[in-house]
Structure formats: C-alpha cells, structure tokens
Amino acid sequence: MTPQDFYRTLEEDGFSLSSKQKEQFDTYFKLLVEWNTKINLTAITEENEVYPQHFYDSIAPILQAFLANEPIKLLDIGAGAGFPSLPMKILFPNLEVTIIDSLNKRISFLTLLAQELGLENVHFFHGRAEDFGQDKAFRGQFDVVTARAVARMQVLSELTIPFLKIGGKLIALKAQAADQELEEAKNALCLLFGKVIKNHSYQLPNGDSRFITIVEKKKETPNKYPRKAGLPNKKPL
C-alpha cells in the first residue's frame, strides 16, 4: 500500500486528509525508519507495509466509528513507536493524548516525533503502568485507554482499567480473535468492574484480519489494583 493508496482508502471511508496531515504521516514514516536503526521500534520498515500495518491499523477504531474528533482524554499504554495513539492524533487533532512507556529511549523518540509533527496536547511519561495506575494524577482520569498488541486481556485489563473514568472505555487492538482471551479474563474483568460491550473484527486493506475489543468501566477500581509492577503478568487475576 503506497501513501497514495492509503489516502485514497481513507477518502473512501469519508476522511479526506489535508496537505498537513499527509506531510505528518510522511514525516512519521521517515523518522520511524531513521530511529529504528538506533533503537528497536518495529520489525516493519517498508513503506508499503508501514502504511497499512501500522498507520491504517492504528486508526481503525476511528474508521469503525468508535472514537469522535473531540477533546477527550486518551491514554495509550505501551505505545512503543506511538501506535495507535499518534496516528489517531494526526487524524483527530482534538484528542488529548498521553502515552506511558517503560523504555526511556522510546519516550525520547516520541517526544522528538511529536515536535517534528507539530502535535499539541500530547504528553509522554516513562515508567510502568502498574505504578502510574496508583498515582492519583492518572488513576480514574481518562475517557479512553488504548493498547495495541500489549498483553492478553487477563493481564491488560489490570494494566488499563484503573486509569479510566467510570463509563470510560478500553479499546484493545488485537491481531488474533479475542474469544479465548475474554474467557480467560472473565474473573479479572469482574474484579475490575469492566464489561465487554463490543468484540469487533475488520480487515486491513491487504485482507489480514484484525480485532477490536471494547471494555467499559462500570464502577471504581478497588484500591489494590493494579498490583505491584510485574505481578499482573506473573500472576494474572
């Protein structure tokens, strides 16, 4: 998929990009490839693969009408090279985006990237989700939390739901069908007062299947969650 194919596909979906937005995606791709030689950001570096597998996939929740171009507070956990939240931010500039990532080198890349792209209302923090999830400045503060290929739902729910306001939504982007994951995560979702409200499948332009699971937070998260860093992964709920 060339950039032109990408823009054409978005136009067919009702999104006509401005010259500025096209330049932002172009700059994003170039910086991604440049920095990937310094730190491990992605195994996908060919232009015709980055546009469908990273950019298109990242904005899928917007294309599927799960997000609006409003000043909602969005947190991206383990965004790595900025996926999915920064492509979302390019398409929907009104989003207020916060990213937490455990690797400081990735935060350095994201900070430079946001400056080069001219993105406003983006915030980057280095650390573990488990630690920030117990910080009152972050806990229960977000309308939406996104996570793309971060962890199985049994673990992911504990890393993300504490950040949500009541009524807020976790949007989890997956490469595999989530049915088995959701079965395993029933206890975790119950303890964290999260309810699955949508389990959606779609296709990338190349025909590959992808999946979006949306979980709504129904009540305040019990104070003991998230547990200490590493425990959610070692001993899932």
Curated annotation (Swiss-Prot):
InterPro entries: rRNA_ssu_MeTfrase_G, SAM-dependent_MTases_sf
Superkingdom of source: Bacteria
UniProt binding sites for S-adenosyl-L-methionine: 78, 83, 129-130, 148
Disulphide bonds in the chain: none
Main location: cytoplasm
Listed CDD domains: AdoMet_MTases
Annotated keywords: Cytoplasm, Methyltransferase, rRNA processing, S-adenosyl-L-methionine, Transferase
Annotated localization: Cytoplasm
E.C. no: 2.1.1.-
GO cellular component: cytosol
Signal peptide: none
Coiled coil: none
One GO MF term: rRNA (guanine-N7-)-methyltransferase activity
EC main group: transferase
Pfam families (alphabetical): GidB
Family (UniProt): Belongs to the methyltransferase superfamily. RNA methyltransferase RsmG family.
NCBIfam families linked to this entry: rsmG_gidB (TIGR00138)
Task performed by this protein: Specifically methylates the N7 position of a guanine in 16S rRNA.
Name of the featured protein: Ribosomal RNA small subunit methyltransferase G
Organism of origin: Streptococcus pyogenes serotype M12 (strain MGAS9429)
